[in-house]
């Protein structure tokens, strides 16, 4: 097998987070484009993971960051243009907030999260509409820590935005209520219907990350893989094949590598 990499999570993402939207100038855009083109030249098959809204979760430790930027940030719009130009997708992390809301009082969240979360649904759709040639992969479908990303909202967004794709994250161990799987690892009917209605828009995503500082690392554990196998086994064969590998091969142009 082969390993093909995305890039920009440690550089483009940092440049976006460090730039106030109303302070982005031509020099900032030039430096951002230069870095993005270096990533493409190095062989990346995607830009990302780029954090638009990233909650800090206790399970990931106290160092797990809270990150926020408006999805219609000028550098994100520029990245969409570059992604369309270079014909590679953008992988985005967006914990969805349809309208301003209080952070739910749940033990899952670290204290570094703000008490009030800003709406980002409308600005996310502005990013999607900015350049329809940009393939945008919204990460972690099937995991919903805020309870704001149920199948009906995703169905509406997929219908309105033909350049929107999603990667599934089904996690390990017994899934909580906000997962696409129930506690018996049965794929919820609302999720199965969504996948069947949009068979070319979903891929598998394990959400495992690796850094050069942290020493030996491993991929997804057996519990996580078991969840994916269980979900795929409950789908029609052609749908399972598309989600397991066919869609990723097309969206990320893996056959061209």
List where the protein language model places each region.
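Mid-to-C-terminal alpha-helical segments outside catalytic/metal-binding sites
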Residues: 189, 196-203, 209-257
């Amino acid at each position: 097998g082969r390993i093909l990499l995305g890039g920009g999570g440690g550089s483009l993402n940092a440049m976006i987070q460090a730039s106030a939207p109303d302070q982005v100038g031509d020099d900032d855009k030039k430096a951002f484009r230069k870095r993005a083109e270096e990533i493409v030249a190095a062989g990346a098959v995607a830009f990302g993971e780029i954090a638009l809204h990233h909650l800090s979760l206790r399970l990931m430790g106290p160092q797990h960051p809270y990150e926020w930027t408006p999805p219609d940030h000028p550098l994100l719009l520029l990245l969409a243009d570059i992604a369309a130009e270079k014909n590679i997708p953008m992988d985005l992390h967006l914990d969805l907030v349809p309208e301003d809301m209080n952070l739910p009082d749940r033990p899952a969240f670290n204290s570094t999260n703000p008490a009030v979360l800003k709406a980002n649904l409308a600005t996310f759709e502005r990013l999607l509409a900015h350049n329809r040639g940009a393939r945008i992969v919204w990460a972690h479908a099937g995991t919903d820590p805020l309870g704001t990303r149920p199948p009906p909202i995703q169905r509406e967004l997929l219908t309105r935005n033909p350049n929107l794709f999603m990667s599934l994250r089904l996690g390990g161990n017994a899934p909580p209520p906000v997962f696409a799987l129930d506690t018996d690892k049965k794929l919820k009917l609302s999720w199965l219907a969504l996948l069947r209605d949009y068979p070319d828009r979903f891929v598998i995503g394990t959400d495992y990350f690796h850094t050069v500082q942290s020493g030996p690392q491993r991929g997804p554990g057996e519990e996580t893989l078991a969840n994916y196998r269980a979900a795929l086994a409950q789908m029609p064969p052609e749908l399972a094949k598309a989600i397991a590998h066919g869609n990723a091969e097309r969206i990320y142009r893996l056959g061209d590598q």
